[in-house]
């Protein structure tokens, strides 16, 4: 197992840096094309239909055909839009999606034409904070798209998206705090190296579950796709977009899905380390093999996205915000205090007490989550009290019928 030497970053020749940047871009684009096709195929199987099956063998070229179609369609700019902002919004949305992947480690140290390099474009001492900052910029594109469209539905979708990102970005950042405590670094390659013996999904299970919930809300995917809810907002923030501009929004959505899936792999599933029992093979974590393990883990999370979309209904807006503010954030804060205490005990030589505290803390955290969830369910299931006749707005008398203003109850009695 060869972990990248931190001194390698920034010393690659220019052609190797360019090759790695192009490689990351191609990896993301191919993943998006495959994810769209597989999503449609899997949803088709879930709904007892075939899915795409006309373009290419078994429909394998459907995503490519859709991309070409969108690129060649006529671009229509509605009247009344703020044109410069309207055209700039898709670009602001898609560029941060690609930039965030620059610090994701996709493998260990390899040799390319005699040059030792890491399968990672670059790394920073605060790489995870860089990812959080860059992904937060993408929401500006959504908000500006809603504002510049000059329509009510896109504006509501943009405002929903901004509130959604603010709410779930806090929970996502809190889930990372425990990882920073255990790894002792915010560098992505350092966090992967710290998981050589044990993945953090086993040590920090509550943090992992909070992150998985937050990443679905962060990327505006079902059942948290409120900014583009078709039944409420037609198409949400991209209602007024078509052709290549609409394709850029869709590209940004799927690239963001890939990025947060890769971040989950890096933070909790050991990054590019081979899973057990493959890790028993001596060469599993050397050479180009780690790229395969990394890609497989990313696809596990992408399948979770597809699975959730095909099985869960969309939440109401108040339910969605309540989950973020009333459950995820309080649970994360309680779990951080438990992990910080356990980490202090471990560093002072009380490993047994630390392990027991983590186990008890996990149980207590799940108990707190259940209590908060039941409280929210009780508030959501409250019945509306029956209204008396005095509370009902009176119905004006109908022409041709005698009598004063009637309530619905009196009308039913009279009609009967």
Curated annotation (Swiss-Prot):
List, alphabetically, the InterPro entries matched: NADH_UbQ_OxRdtase_su1/FPO, NADH_UbQ_OxRdtase_su1_CS
- Gene Ontology terms describing biological process: aerobic respiration
Report if keyword Zinc is assigned: no
Q: How does it sit in the membrane?
A: Multi-pass membrane protein
E.C. no = 7.1.1.-
Protein localization:
Cell membrane
GO terms of molecular function: NADH dehydrogenase activity; oxidoreductase activity, acting on NAD(P)H, quinone or similar compound as acceptor; quinone binding
What is this enzyme's catalytic activity, as reactions? a quinone + NADH + 5 H(+)(in) = a quinol + NAD(+) + 4 H(+)(out)
Record keyword Transmembrane present: yes
Domain of life of the native organism: Bacteria
PROSITE patterns, from UniProt? COMPLEX1_ND1_1, COMPLEX1_ND1_2
Which Gene Ontology terms of cellular component type are present? plasma membrane
Bilayer-crossing regions = 16-36, 84-104, 124-144, 165-185, 197-217, 260-280, 288-308, 320-340, 353-373
The alphabetized UniProt keywords are: Cell membrane, Membrane, NAD, Quinone, Translocase, Transmembrane, Transmembrane helix
Main subcellular localization, coarse class? Answer: membrane
How this chain assembles, per its entry, is: NDH-1 is composed of 14 different subunits. Subunits NuoA, H, J, K, L, M, N constitute the membrane sector of the complex.
- Per its database record, what is this protein's job? NDH-1 shuttles electrons from NADH, via FMN and iron-sulfur (Fe-S) centers, to quinones in the respiratory chain. The immediate electron acceptor for the enzyme in this species is believed to be menaquinone. Couples the redox reaction to proton translocation (for every two electrons transferred, four hydrogen ions are translocated across the cytoplasmic membrane), and thus conserves the redox energy in a proton gradient. This subunit may bind ubiquinone.
User: What's this protein's family per the entry?
Assistant: Belongs to the complex I subunit 1 family.
Q: What is this protein called?
A: NADH-quinone oxidoreductase subunit H
Q: What is the lineage of its organism?
A: Bacteria, Bacillati, Actinomycetota, Actinomycetes, Mycobacteriales
Gene symbol of the encoding locus? nuoH
